[in-house]
Amino acid sequence: MLNILEVHETNQMIEQEKLDVRTITMGIDLMDCVSTDLQTTCDLIYNKITSYAKDLVSTGESIERDFGIPIVNKRITVTPIALVGASCCKTSADFVQIAHALDRAAKTVGVDLIGGYSALVSKSMTPAEELLIRSLPAALSETDIVCSSVNVGSTKTGIDMNSVELLGHIIKEIAEATADIDSYGCVKFVAFCNAPDDNPFMAGGFHGVTEGDAVINVGVSGPGVVSRALDAAKGKDFEFLCETIKRTAFKITRVGQLVAQEASKRLGIPFGIIDLSLAPTPAVGDSVGEVLEKIGLAQVGAPGTTAALAMLNDQVKKGGIMASSYVGGLSGAFIPVSEDKNMIDAAESGCLTIEKLEAMTCVCSVGLDMIAIPGDTTASTISGIIADEAAIGMVNQKTTAVRVIPVVGKTVGQMANFGGLMGYAPIMPVNTASCEAFVTRGGRIPAPIHSFKN
């Protein structure tokens, strides 16, 4: 039974502590849109998305009004387009036409972003998947709200180094194609290892082939709430600290569960999962970095940062999992540098480095996220960063990802501005020692020994 104190507490979370639902994401299966004719495929995709998602935005807004819970984004994910377009796309330009169809459909229904311009190449690339990857510079520079991801490895299959090597060049080309807006195209692309099928967050969201025809997934966001709760834990031991985070995560997730069930009921589409992730914004007081500093670090990146993040991540999961019937997606703490005020400050001061962020990715939700690097960083260095991160995911049986932005024309110490939720970031130094001979060997890195469970 709810008591009046808990009601006031939830109101306070929303009004003062920046609790919000980061996204209601509708996943839509497009396998029934496959045809051998490009224009037919584009029309089928447009019609299905605009039919299924026509009420998504208005439903989200009505839930906001009825419950007083801010819902920041409404998004769509679709079946990886490399699969959908394989029959009709004979060139990279053909895939770009599908990207335009996705962009038009998403704008018609009024969502913020659409994800799923994706390829799953954890073992090897088909010709269609390679065409889609090569189409990315044009697709991401010519569209506004289409997001893309490529899964380059998994614990079961190893890492496809051919696609990793290719992506280094592609990311450079995306950066060049959007050089006039601080290489913003790279913000809409992420390379994954062990990508989940039900991720509601961008840029890595896609509607996996294991999913049904349509589904509602919800991502919550509450670092500000956790930060405020930790004020009461100052000077207390780890048991009290963990209990505080756990209880707070439960309350945050309960809000997400309510929104997910209500959206599912109103739209007539099954509820999929709640993603438990703590997703920051560039606003003051809405920072995962601030939470880590309240745990006891002078600044993010100090010794102890990885341990503090591991503990935070675990307690968020332990608290959140009891509050939802289905948990999935990425579920943990996000550490996107440009989207987190305290991390931006730590990166600027030099306390937070890419190497430290890589260590942090071993214990948190995703990987090297929203990191601006010098525009003259070589393609092989970017491939090496992706390979390192994929190896962490592969060996530790977790999702890892890389979203780096080589900002054309800028170097260490300058600032890149991406705007809105994407924030701004100092250009961070990258180790310039060459790994070209390694990433150009060709072939794949085998799956680790502990992946053989049968």
Curated annotation (Swiss-Prot):
A Pfam family for this UniProt protein? Answer: DUF711
- Hey, what's the signal peptide range on this chain? none
Query: CDD domains, alphabetically?
Result: RNR_PFL_like_DUF711 (cd08025)
Tell me which SUPFAM superfamilies the record gives. Answer: PFL-like glycyl radical enzymes
| Entry-linked Gene3D superfamilies | 3.20.70.20
Please give the subunit comment from the record. Answer: Homodimer.
**HAMAP family in UniProt:** UPF0210
What family is this? Belongs to the UPF0210 family.
Q: What is this protein called?
A: UPF0210 protein BLA_0552
- Name its species: Bifidobacterium animalis subsp. lactis (strain AD011)
